Amino acid sequence: MKLPIFIADAFTARAFRGDPAAVCLLENELDEDMHQKIAREMNLSETAFIRKLHPTDNFAQSSCFGLRWFTPASEVPLCGHATLASAAVLFHKIKNMTSMLTFVTLSGELRARRAEDGIILDFPLYPAHPQDFHEVEDLIKTAIGNTLVQDICYSPDTRKLLIRLSDVYDRSFLENLKVNTENLLQVENTGKVKGLILTLKGEPGGQTQAFDFYSRYFAPWVAVAEDPVTGSAHAVLSSYWSQHLGKKEMHAFQCSRRGGELGISLRPDGRVDITGSAAVVLEGTLTV
């Protein structure tokens, strides 16, 4: 069997930045275990599988598809950058002419629509609630040592722990912070936490571009030590920072080595629009 496959760098307009995701187009149903084997072979933080929902569907003309995401270790319920990569492949490489795509996923229907400055993802907005420090003290100390922490919240919907670093730190500190992910699986093995968000309040622009907040994201529980740019984490971050900054429109930067920018707009219906660009850097055929 031969499958069309692509790699797209998401949340960037330039190759070799942002977050790379593999995108596989499925004309027919794939054996269940083959999804995981392909994701392991691609060895990226996520591999997306776009499937037709009806035999008469066409990747170039239809507007609604099934979408699943796999890390090298397991299937995940939501992945922003691989959704953006999937939309970019359909819009820019397959030349799908619809103005909006709908993806049927484990997290419900997600929509991606064209915009002048990229692609807009319509995502759920997940609240984060205050978390008692002592319950997660070992996890925090293991990950970031004695780094000063200003706030801790937990998102039960996504099982992500959000740690806001002290406002005394700047972007450079977050970028250079050494985070110990190797021992997190031993410290947190209850299943409560599946992802760790570190975040920091933004700074005035000055000579550099202004961002409302910065972040990094770690998910060793699903075999992703650090994810370069994470749309699903921003479905939590958007809720948190909107409350603390009193803003509905925000500009975010994820401070991984590759780095990526996200535009954020909270909607009246309780969801969030996340805007980003994507660069398709590889296209080929996978033989299985």
Curated annotation (Swiss-Prot):
Keywords: Isomerase. It comes from the Eukaryota. Transmembrane segments: none annotated. One of its GO terms (molecular function) is isomerase activity. The active site is at E46. The keyword Isomerase applies. Its EC number is 5.1.-.-. Pfam families: PhzC-PhzF. Gene3D superfamilies: Diaminopimelate Epimerase, Chain A, domain 1. GO terms for cellular component: cytoplasm. InterPro entries: Phenazine_PhzF-like (IPR003719). Interacts with UNRIP/MAWD. Belongs to the PhzF family. This is Phenazine biosynthesis-like domain-containing protein.
